[in-house]
C-alpha cells in the first residue's frame, strides 16, 4: 500500500509539472520484435533510459486474440527472463493486434498513464525490402502522434571496454540537433561509454560560414552544460564522402532524418543505405522539438 500511495502522489506531482527542456526525461517505447535479433536495440534503449528514464519493450503478435493468448504468455515469460538475466530496469509488454500497421496508432495513444506517456518511439532499421513501405508508414504515424523517433541501424560490434570512444552528431539544421545531442549525452553517461568524446559536426562550403556555425554549436553545448567538441568541416565534397572521412572510425553516429513524402519511401531508404554503407552503428532521429538546448 505504501509503495502504491507514493506512486500515486508522485504521478500527481508529475501531472502538475510544466513541461520544458530542463525537466525533460525519456519515456521510451521500443518495438523489439524477435528479441534475440534486436539485442543492441534493447541495449540502446537501456542506455537512453539510464536512471531517469522509463523504457517499455514491446513485442507485437499479429493475429486473432483467441488464437494467440498462449503465444503471448510465452513471449512475456521469455522477455521477463531476458530482463532478469541481464539485470535490466525495463518493462516488458506483449500485445496482440489483428493488424500491426493499423493497430499501432491506438496502442501508442493508449500506452501508460498521462504523466508518463511515451515521448520516444524506437525501431530497428528494416532489413527486408518488403517491410520498407510499412516501416515508413509507422514513422508517419508516430510523427502525427507528436512523438520523437529513434531508429537504430545496427552494425553490431561497436564498443571496446576501457578504450576511448567517440560519438559524432552531424548537425544539418536546428530541427533535430538538440535532440541528437541529448541522446548522445544520455548514452555517454553509462559506464560502458566512459572515456567518450561527443563531437558536434557540421559541413560548410567555405571559411566564411565556419565561424558562425562553430559559435552556434559551442553555444548550444555551453547552454546545455554538455561537454562536447564542436568541429566544422570545410568541404565541397559530397556529404557521404565527408561523413565517411570523418566518422567511419567513430563508435556511434547520430543523424537527423526527415519522413519522405508518399511514393518516395524506397528512394529515401536506398539513399540512407548508401550513405551509411561504410559507417558504424548509426542512430537516425526525427525530433518533435520538445528538447531545445538553446532555451
Regions found by a protein language model. Name each.
Residues 1-295:
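Membrane-embedded alpha-helical bundles that form conduits across membranes
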